[in-house]
Structure formats: structure tokens, C-alpha cells
């Protein structure tokens, strides 16, 4: 995984973001509601778009649009009516864009609940859209994807544009012309569809504004026809040849305004000669444009938002799904193709509450920390090579004891997380002396940081070590497993659970072939109560107070005070041991995704059904005893899972010394195995939390999204609709005038969105062309 180091000194990765909800889903990935962990913006809520690199790379044009979105967001940062970018980073398999969370949700949702807007409400939205689009054009950007789903309302009711994946950014010296056939077909202008030889300009966005204006005032789409064919080709033909079927009852000025925006002849279109044409139209005469630019117009629609995590104005089909970080394959040359993607907003650069702030990297560090007991005793290696690791709460660096030059690793934690560091130190002190547990040598504290000085381990992590071996046998795997089981048993005997057992937390003391392993990172370890009464009491406390396991895959319930949390005990550690053993012997992670299209929910289902097998060439030479042990550890029911006593007495651990047949693991172990392992562990923890009762994937298919959203409306606390007459969209008949009905009840078989591709408003598949 790539951690992003900005010139100002900050790194961000998935460990800095806890997944809370799913906000949207599309062809290339998902949009999550996330909480920031650590740093100056600790606990801030954001929206994170996560894209799979393998899917982005399916088309050259899609790759170009993805990279362009990141550039456009940086260029537009700080613009009032546009969603702000805060971070962009990548892993080996995915791209991440972290933006502000606009809690009022999609304009689409609000229009669905009302049927259509009155003139005052529509005029307000249109005015702010004019300002927003003009701000794009002033910055040399064509939006190209203005539609209801990409218009958000903030908590005050002001407009925010999102999703700039199809935007075109013109660089200095470039002609302000584009050529791509891209966007959502019912919002495309004739010149985008026809693509004249000279390309098209930003005037295409004013056409899309005309479509939006029509939809706001009628609840209907101007170029779709009920009872007729509504393929992309059919819609495109109507855009090119048909007149807009205005209702006879539409306001005269509104009709003229929309008609001029939807003028097929480019030179006659409103906005062709500049934005002032639009601002000066009679329909917009009541707008104070200075106030509009300053966001001081009084919003007509103000969303009623209950709390920071309120997602009522986003599709329930997505928000009801578990927020799982699904596995993905790593494409070849990904780092080269996506170089320069990363970004951290200047407004969130860490200060003194960073896990390790800029103050430790300053030239005058000795003067700054003259009173620090750590710096009086140790010299910190501030070079790139001295950085050994980084998490959400800490960094690990190489250090040298001043008196004798002895080398150590120091875990440095901000005083903001001093209580967690002190707890980790106490647990480490309790488990000292075991040969397979990292040794704690010293503990220090100063006004800025908490320091855990530990032995330095120069060997590799478990899977990396195996990957580098030319020959790896079942006997050697058993030796590793014996050491690991010994360490975990030592913890459990002291009523301690590790809660984060995974290959990257298993390191070796050196690169020597006979080196012993060490279990490291006790940041999420906890003491178990000694009696059932204490245990029940402790579970209640833990449910309210303690986040646990690897935070980049942590569930929202584990991070939110007052929410429920899985009941962790020794059984979770034992299950993790089973996954480690399976991976060592086969080079594969059990329950892992069988295809790139597979969801994390499906992984959870396989975990709950214990669906793993010993088929394939990798298992040919693996002993029956090893398979028996894995089966016992990966048993779903914790009451039937192998106990620690049964594990230590198992035949395989006692009699595997003679099994010298080479395993295929070193040659087939993928580079993404660590990430896949973590995703599998997180899926298990989700399932464990829910008592292994899973959401049926068929209950929320993507194809139902439009139908669900059309039926959205105000609901009471029980979830029942307050209005039995559900508002639905309808399509106007082609080539004739249609009367507007005053009734909000519309035929259930009609809907302006029925024809659309089932793509999210924030992530979609785009059509490519030879030029951008």
C-alpha cells in the first residue's frame, strides 16, 4: 500500500479512515461515509469515493477521466458551490478521493419526495447552479455531467456540485474545446452527441441546465417518452430532432427560459454569449446575483438533518448495506499509471496533535524537546530509512541509545492517544519474557508524545518472508505455527486477547533462516475479566468505549460511542490462527473473492457457511492432519471451534517434523495477500458482530435503485410513509402539449428514470473516444 507523504509532512492511508456507511455504488467502486482517525481533523466526517484500479484501466479514456477528476478537484478547491477535496491517495488495488460530506443528499431525492418544485424553489436552485457552473467555466473547466444525482444540498439548503469524473480541465495554452462523447444521455446537448469537427465548448453545460430546469418544474424528463422506446439511441434522436413538449400550464417566462437553454442551434442558445445572458433573462429577474454569489440567498428547501451521520437523503438501498472494503486485484504498472494521484488539503495538515507532528522532524528538535526524557536517552533516526512503520495512532522509527549506540524501534504516539499507549505499555509489560512476543525495553513521555521503546526486528513480515523463500515445507509451516500458538496461548493464559492477529503483525527477529518470530502491535489488545459477572459488565463497557482491530477495516459500530460492538474473546484469535495457517499452506486466503465483481458481503456469506475447500494443486501434498486442524479452527460456531487446549494438543503440531515435501506457497502467494487477509478478517468480525445473520444480497440489487428513490418521501419514526399518495415521475407524450395535473399521485407504471443505466450518481461507466 502507498502511504502518501506530502511536502508538509503528512501521510494518509486507509488506516486513517473508518468506514461508516455506503452512500453509493457504481461500475468502478463505491462511495462511503467515513470518519477521520487521528490528526488535526480527527473525528471529522467525510465522503470517500473508492475506485478499483483494474476497472478504471479497462478503457484508456476512463483512466484519463479518473486522473482528471483528481486534478479538477484540486483546481476547484474552496469554490463555494462545489464539493471540496480533502485527500486523495491510493493502495496497490484502489484509488481513494476523500471529500466533504454534504448531508442534505441528492437533489434527486428531494424532487422525488415532492413531485416537482414550485417556481420560487426551482428559481433558487437554478440561480445557485448558474453561479456554480459559471465558477467552473471561469476556472477553465467544462462540467459535462450536470444532472439531478450530481447536485447535492447542504444542511442549509444551498447547492453543491459533486462528481467531476467527466469534467474537462483546460491547461494553459489549450483551446477551450472538447470532443468526448460522455455524460448521461438525457442531459447531453446536441453537439456532444453529434461531436462536430471543431469540438464543443462549455456551452454544453447550459443545455444540461435547461434539462434540469424542466425536470424541477415538471417532475418529468423532456426527452423520454412513456410507452415508447427509451434506449440511448432513441433519446439521442429526440434531443437532435424533437421539440421540447412543454406543459400548457407552465409559467410563460419559465418556458421561454428553458426553451432558450434547450435551443439546438448553438449560436442561439442562452449562455452562448456569456453567463450574463442567463442572469438577465426575465425568469431570473428577481434574483440578487451578488447575494447568490455570496451564498446569502435564503434557501427555499432546508433539509431536516438529525445528526452528523444522518443519511436519510441518500438511497436506502446503499445506506442499508454493510460498509465493507471489498477485495480487489492489483493491476500491472499501477504505481506508474497513477503517479501523482495523491493529495492532502492544506487545511488538514496535522499540527501538534498528530501521531508524530512536524515538530519531531524540525532541525531544532533538541531545543524543542529539551525536557523530554526520551530525547535525553535516545537519538531518533529522522531519515526515510529510519521510518519502520506508520498507523493511524502512531509511527515507528529506528532510534539509537546514546550511551552505547544500541539500536531499538520506538513507537511514538501523540499525547492525544496517551491512554491507548499506556494501556498497550501495561499489556506489553505483562507479557514480557516470552520468546515470540516483542520485547518492551523502555517507556517515556513528554508534553507532546508517548514513547514505547522496543527491540528492533530486522526480519520480514510473515508472508513477505515466505514469498522470498526458494523452498518452504509443511514442517517449516508447523514450526512457525507452533511459535505463534505458543505466543497466543501465553496471552490467553494471562487473560489477554490480541484482537488483531494477521500476517503483518507477525515479524521475524532477523533474516536468518533459523530466526524466531515475534508477535507485535498490541494496540488493540485487551484484558479479559476473570469472572462471568465481570465479563458481562466488561462487555457493556467495551461496547460503549473501545474501538478495536485494524481501523482501516473497522465497522462504524466499533468506533461510535454508544453503539454496539462484537463480543471479543479468545475465539476470535483462534479463528485468525486458522486463516494464517490456511494462507501459509496454500498461498491463498480462505473465503477470498473469486472474481473482481464479487462483493464483501458474499465473502461474509461464505465465512458464515464455512465455505472453503482444499481443492487445487496447492493442497495436493498437504497432510490430512493439517487440513483437519484448519477445519477445526475455521468452524463457524465458536462453541464448536477448537479450544486452545485442543489446538496445542493437536497431532499436526506434535508430529509434523517429518513432513518435508515442498509447498507451492512461495511461488503462488500474491502480493495482495496481506490486504486480502485483512479484508477477510474484517468480514469475519462483521459477521461475528451480527451473530452470523447476513443481509441477503438479493434484497438490495442495484437495478432497484430508481424504483426505491421514486418512492422516497417523508416517513415517521416507524418508517411508514406519512402520505399514502406516493409521488412518482412521469414522462410527457412526444410531439404534443401535455396538461400539468395538480394531483401528486401518478401512475405507478411511469417514471422519468426507468430507462436509465443503473449507475450511481457519483460513479459511472463513461463512453470513451479518441480525444478528450
Curated annotation (Swiss-Prot):
Activity control, per UniProt: Activated by multiple phosphorylations on threonine and serine residues.
Keyword Ion transport: no
Binding of ATP, residues: 23-31, 49, 388-396, 411
Residue span(s) of domain AGC-kinase C-terminal: 285-353
GO BP annotations listed: regulation of DNA-templated transcription; TORC1 signaling
Start-end of Polar residues biased regions: 718-727, 739-748
Protein name stated in the entry: Putative ribosomal protein S6 kinase alpha-2
Gene: rskn-2
